[in-house]
């Protein structure tokens, strides 16, 4: 007990916490050392004394050194790096600066978690990581009350006690993977932790005293924005898009290859992968926004080279140079067809663009028109919003049927089947609206859609094209898939400033406001133009339809 009193005197606790601990020590004095209650009280006092109340790391104020660390550890990711340098710059001028709460949102394998470690080194903070994937119990965050047998503080307090300072960098990994059940909602418990206005009085259920978390720098990582809104509101979101081919090649040469050579006991004089081979490796053996799959493929090559050396008579590896034709020998047949989207023009088939948890992707949209009774089939695991997009696209086509030279009453005697492969993958969202509409027009007019054109945009019943999200990821996917032309909503023109100039040079990006502007670009022939050539033979109703189209700013000629 004397030892506990000495530790308490040097702990630097606030008055209220010190008073609480003193009363517990007094209680312990009056108990039998062998009683179960004494063990509980002793455990509580130990936790109170283990938590860092005053001890801090000295935060680095050397901005240039921090910048060098961030640049050397990660390629690209300029938004995050700028935000950290801004924080360090402000810190030099302000005595008490609350730690920022950043949330890095991006696909797997882009370096979110490893970036957290780099930021800790750049700011000279100790690094603590807490995986939130699968956490369902509120007590994991806030701790259990002392009335429970075997109760402990929450993971936040436990990790701080383990690291020994009150201002570490705390990485909350996979914050979007938290669940909830009858034991409470951990996302709601995190509201207090991540709110800079409240977290200086964080109350753990076990400690029962206020603890100041305002010195902690919290960084959260997530694969999607599927995070409860109140929690999202408390964090500063920094989106990390996928890497471009050139960036992947640089990362592989500078970081991944040297790392795998070291892990597999090889030297640079034993294995070299040419730039062209690295590009083919990225194109034909991986399809991802990050570089995790690329690292696995490089590791596979390294293992094969080591095996070859182990089976050789002299047990040493001579220099192995990997050229493009060698990849099949080391990695097997090609897994992906690079440039597959550049296939021939097909009737009723359009390339759309989507955003998934692993970045942007190409989406094939198929529509078949067959004689029947006017039924509509939708297959391909479509979500509610996408099913509504199909209905909206159908109405747009019906309202323009005469102007598009589509058979009168087609909705009563033609069955339309909308299918979006791959069938087992769930799909949702409104951004495939113009793709579905174009595929329907192509199927009903028998005019092929251009295979080298991809499109994204939400459609209204009047045929107006509305803005979508994730434009950068979608354009990166189009670039990866060798698409030549991408049609986007006019409202997304402002987002083009964030797109790398290399992508914009190699892609023709065309903004549109109405579905009618799309037909000249996406179809091999424009049904409006075909109809205009025989305008004199139109009946009054069709003439009126054509005027509607012209009034929306699209000339039929």
Indicate where each model-derived feature is located.
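Extended, charged alpha-helical coiled-coil/arm scaffolds that mediate oligomerization and mechanical coupling
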Residues: 1-95
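AAA+/SF3 P-loop NTPase mechanochemical coupling elements
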Residues: 163-167, 202-221, 271-273, 414
């Amino acid at each position: 007990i004397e030892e506990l009193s000495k530790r308490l005197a040097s702990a630097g606790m606030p008055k209220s916490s010190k008073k609480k601990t003193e009363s517990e020590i007094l209680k312990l004095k009056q108990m039998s050392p062998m009683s179960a209650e004494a063990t509980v009280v002793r455990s509580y006092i130990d936790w109170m004394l283990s938590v860092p109340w005053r001890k801090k790391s000295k935060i680095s104020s050397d901005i240039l050194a921090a910048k060098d660390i961030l640049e050397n550890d990660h390629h690209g990711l300029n938004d995050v790096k700028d935000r950290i340098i801004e924080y360090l710059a402000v810190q030099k001028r302000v005595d008490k600066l609350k730690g920022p709460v950043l949330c890095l949102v991006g696909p797997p394998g882009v370096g979110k978690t490893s970036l957290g470690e780099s930021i800790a080194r750049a700011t000279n903070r100790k690094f603590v990581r807490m995986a939130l994937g699968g956490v369902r119990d509120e007590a994991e965050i806030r701790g259990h009350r002392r009335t429970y047998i075997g109760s402990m503080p929450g993971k936040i307090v436990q990790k701080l006690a383990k690291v020994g300072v009150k201002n570490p960098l705390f990485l909350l990994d996979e914050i979007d993977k938290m669940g909830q059940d009858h034991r409470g909602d951990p996302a709601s418990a995190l509201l207090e932790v991540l709110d800079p206005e409240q977290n200086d009085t964080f109350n753990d259920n076990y400690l029962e005293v206020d603890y100041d978390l305002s010195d902690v720098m919290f960084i959260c990582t997530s694969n999607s924005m599927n995070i409860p809104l109140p929690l999202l509101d408390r964090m500063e979101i920094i989106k990390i898009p996928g890497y471009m081919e050139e960036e992947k090649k640089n990362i592989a040469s500078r970081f991944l290859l040297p790392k795998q050579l070291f892990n597999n006991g090889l030297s640079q004089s034993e294995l070299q992968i040419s730039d062209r081979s690295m590009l083919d490796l990225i194109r034909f053996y991986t399809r991802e926004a990050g570089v995790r799959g690329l690292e696995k493929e490089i590791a596979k090559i390294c293992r094969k080279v080591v095996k070859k050396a182990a089976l050789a008579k002299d047990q040493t590896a001579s220099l192995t140079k990997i050229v493009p034709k060698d990849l099949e020998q080391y990695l097997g047949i090609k897994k992906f067809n690079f440039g597959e989207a550049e296939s021939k023009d097909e009737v009723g088939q359009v390339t759309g663009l989507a955003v998934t948890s692993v970045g942007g992707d190409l989406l094939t949209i198929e529509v078949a028109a067959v004689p029947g009774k006017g039924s509509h089939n939708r297959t391909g695991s479509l979500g509610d919003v996408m099913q509504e997009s199909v209905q909206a696209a159908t109405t747009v086509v019906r309202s323009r049927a005469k102007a598009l030279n589509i058979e009168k009453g087609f909705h009563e005697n033609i069955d339309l089947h909308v299918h979006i492969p791959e069938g087992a993958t769930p799909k949702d969202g409104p951004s495939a609206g113009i793709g579905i509409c174009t595929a329907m027009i192509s199927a009903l007019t028998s005019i092929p859609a251009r295979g080298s054109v991809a499109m994204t945009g939400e459609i209204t019943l009047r045929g107006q094209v509305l803005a979508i999200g994730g434009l950068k990821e979608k354009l990166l996917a189009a670039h990866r898939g060798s698409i030549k032309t991408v049609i986007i909503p006019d409202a997304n023109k402002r987002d083009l400033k964030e797109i790398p100039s290399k992508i914009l040079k190699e892609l023709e990006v065309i903004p549109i406001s109405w579905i009618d502007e799309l037909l000249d670009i996406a179809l091999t022939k424009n049904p409006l133009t075909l109809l205009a050539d025989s305008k004199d033979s139109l009946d009054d109703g069709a003439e009126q339809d054509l005027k509607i189209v012209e009034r929306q700013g699209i000339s039929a000629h």
